Amino acid sequence: MTNIRKTHPLLKIINNSLVDLPAPSSLSAWWNFGSLLGVCLAVQILTGLFLAMHYTSDTATAFNSVTHICRDVNYGWVLRYLHANGASMFFICLYLHVGRGLYYGSYTYSETWNVGILLLSAVMATAFMGYVLPWGQMSFWGATVITNLLSAIPYIGTDLVQWIWGGFSVDKATLTRFFAFHFLLPFIVAALVMVHLLFLHETGSNNPTGIPSDPDMIPFHPYYTIKDILGFLTMLTALSALVLFNPDLLGDPDNYTPANPLNTPPHIKPEWYFLFAYAILRSIPNKLGGVLALVMSILILAIVPMLHTSKQRSMMFRPLSQCLFWLLVAILLTLTWIGGQPVEYPYVIIGQTASILYFLTILIFMPLVSIMENHLLKW
């Protein structure tokens, strides 16, 4: 008799995605991050759901409702810190996942890659709106500064900002709508994840060599299920350690002060995972130019497949491209550091240099070095 998992209409889909899926035999730990992101999303949706049961999206009570969750709700502090630090874990996994895609040439699966860029943008929007909800000083001023950037758009900018705010400043209407969108977007993200996987399973997974692996495939279960479970345990251990030992390590002390429109914090900055983009924004003196650079710093990923000039897919056998890739990583770490520093010498010039190098590396250096490596193959 045929196994029910292969015949049942619903179980068949799960079976073909998680059990009998043919996978390349050479996948390294870098292929764990997709499933880790799934776990992060599940943790965020679950903790967020329970937090939403106690949170109130009103300027008068939002800050106090978060305090109430931490002090009075059973294990409310665990929920709150799991949600806040879970977001950090989410972005660590996201950036490593994107980095893996860049290094091993996974972007040649253009549909999967483009849906991935959509996912990254949606998660970033969700995280930004979530940071506004506790209604601390950095929540309020972060929301004010970032939404105000839209006023740089010619003609419609000012009207657009006031439309998003629901008034003439960040206020009750803004908080309420941000809560509504923050609740809704993760479910849209979950739907996009399904589309992402649908496109991925059309082509099959890439592998570290970048060479087609059709002749050498193994079933996903048990080989990669056990590998993924090890990844889950490692990540959840790290998250638990962060939540239980140092929950405020990645947060901002200013957010423990209730929002006050009359008092601006000395250094307005977003959460650490947006600092690289914030540094690029600040490094351009012109407002509209800064906004365009900010948007391009993420959307540049969409043109990476067009810039692939190498005859090889993966960087595994391309040492010169590897050097440039790790230079890019160093540039992004520098930008993250600069984004958290005050706007003064020498930080401004370091940020401007790193921003220029970021775009030059992706747009010019990498394609040129790939062409050079193609010529070296003929030696």
From Swiss-Prot:
Q: Which InterPro entries match?
A: Cyt_b/b6_C, Cyt_b/b6_C_sf, Cyt_b/b6_N, Cytb/b6-like_sf, Cytochrome_b, Cytochrome_b_C_euk/bac, Cytochrome_b_N_euk/bac, Di-haem_cyt_TM
The main place the protein resides is mitochondrion
Against PROSITE patterns, the record matches this protein to: CYTB_CTER, CYTB_NTER
Keyword check for Nucleotide-binding: no
Residue ranges that the Swiss-Prot or TrEMBL entry lists as coiled coil: none
Any single biological process term in GO: mitochondrial electron transport, ubiquinol to cytochrome c
The record describes how the cofactor is bound as: Binds 2 heme b groups non-covalently.
Q: Where in the cell is it found?
A: Mitochondrion inner membrane
> Which keywords are on file for this protein?
Electron transport, Heme, Iron, Membrane, Metal-binding, Mitochondrion, Mitochondrion inner membrane, Respiratory chain, Transmembrane, Transmembrane helix, Transport, Ubiquinone
Query: SUPFAM superfamilies, alphabetically?
Result: a domain/subunit of cytochrome bc1 complex (Ubiquinol-cytochrome c reductase), Transmembrane di-heme cytochromes
- What membrane topology does the UniProt entry give? Multi-pass membrane protein
Q: Which residues cross the membrane?
A: 33-53, 77-98, 113-133, 178-198, 226-246, 288-308, 320-340, 347-367
Q: Enumerate the Pfam families for this protein.
A: Cytochrom_B_C (PF00032), Cytochrome_B (PF00033)
An example GO CC term for this entry is: respiratory chain complex III
- Tell me where on the tree of life, at the top rank, the source sits: Eukaryota
* Cofactors named for this entry: heme b
Q: Where does heme b b566 bind?
A: 97, 196
Keyword Glycosyltransferase (UniProt) = no
One GO molecular-function entry: metal ion binding
Listed binding positions for heme b b562 are: 83, 182
PANTHER family given in the database record = CYTOCHROME B
The miscellaneous remark of the record is: Heme 1 (or BL or b562) is low-potential and absorbs at about 562 nm, and heme 2 (or BH or b566) is high-potential and absorbs at about 566 nm.
The record's function comment reads: Component of the ubiquinol-cytochrome c reductase complex (complex III or cytochrome b-c1 complex) that is part of the mitochondrial respiratory chain. The b-c1 complex mediates electron transfer from ubiquinol to cytochrome c. Contributes to the generation of a proton gradient across the mitochondrial membrane that is then used for ATP synthesis.
Q: Which family does it belong to?
A: Belongs to the cytochrome b family.
Q: How does it assemble?
A: The cytochrome bc1 complex contains 11 subunits: 3 respiratory subunits (MT-CYB, CYC1 and UQCRFS1), 2 core proteins (UQCRC1 and UQCRC2) and 6 low-molecular weight proteins (UQCRH/QCR6, UQCRB/QCR7, UQCRQ/QCR8, UQCR10/QCR9, UQCR11/QCR10 and a cleavage product of UQCRFS1). This cytochrome bc1 complex then forms a dimer.
Q: What is this protein called?
A: Cytochrome b
Q: What species is this protein from?
A: Leptonycteris curasoae (Southern long-nosed bat)
Could you read off the lineage of the organism from its UniProt record?
Answer: Eukaryota, Metazoa, Chordata, Craniata, Vertebrata
Q: What is the primary gene name for this protein?
A: MT-CYB
